[in-house]
Amino acid sequence: MIKKLVEEVTAFHHAFGLNVSTNPTVDLPEEIKKLRYNLMKEENEEYLEAIKNDDLVEVADALGDMLYILCGTIISHGLQDKMEYIFDEIQRSNMSKLDTNGRPIYRDDGKVMKGPNYFKPNIAAILKEP
């Protein structure tokens, strides 16, 4: 799924003259870094407003916009060819949060906590791969 989404957002970036990096990078112009952050922040605020108003249409719109902007940010950082592998590694890491009996550990607010078998995702190794 992510590949199709990234391809479509890449077409948008090309059509509108927006940043597209072909190699993984954090070296972006300051204005692009700020823009990507502000776009994500804006959509998070729109999501918050939508859930406060119990407005499913606006929730769906905010989530769709978040995904679109996230794909654009992935493209800006040149991570489009790595993101599926990064996600898979994060998934493996998240599943290692179970306790020794294979049960989840929750914080009072519902956040899943790290269990004794937790391991940090090795994203650096993925970024080093050609």
Give the residues covered by each predicted segment.
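Flexible "arm" and connector segments at domain edges
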Residues: 1-130
